[in-house]
């Protein structure tokens, strides 16, 4: 499928949002809308890293559990997690129990806490100029020069599990790029 498909409400959406009410709500209310704030962006960065190799629907279904397990993504709290917290998280069936991803989330919280700039300012500094919306799903890149630069800078600053593809997914999810298809009903994000 390359064009937005109509949902039961008659609206034309990006095709990935079809098939699940949870996907549809995420698409309509969150995805591609500009998001700022260190805690909110740390949450999205963490969830995008946990999604790597999995369906985003799995992450959406577990998002509330992730919020509880990771103290509402409070950066200072997560940065203070210990081996005991890693063990607790590994026993939590409500989240994705992947030790490398859990440890990366803690490492990333520590990296955010050590930043000399606001996380929001750092991430948004890689947002490219607005461009026309793509006509079809096949027109969407998996990564861009900006996402590669973001991933490099985050790695330099001690972040883990944030490669250029994950960085681009973060850019899409948080409105740094507007990758809703041209025929999608969601208004331009106007960032």
Predicted feature residues:
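HhH-family (HhH-GPD) DNA N-glycosylase catalytic core used in base-excision repair
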Residues: 1-191
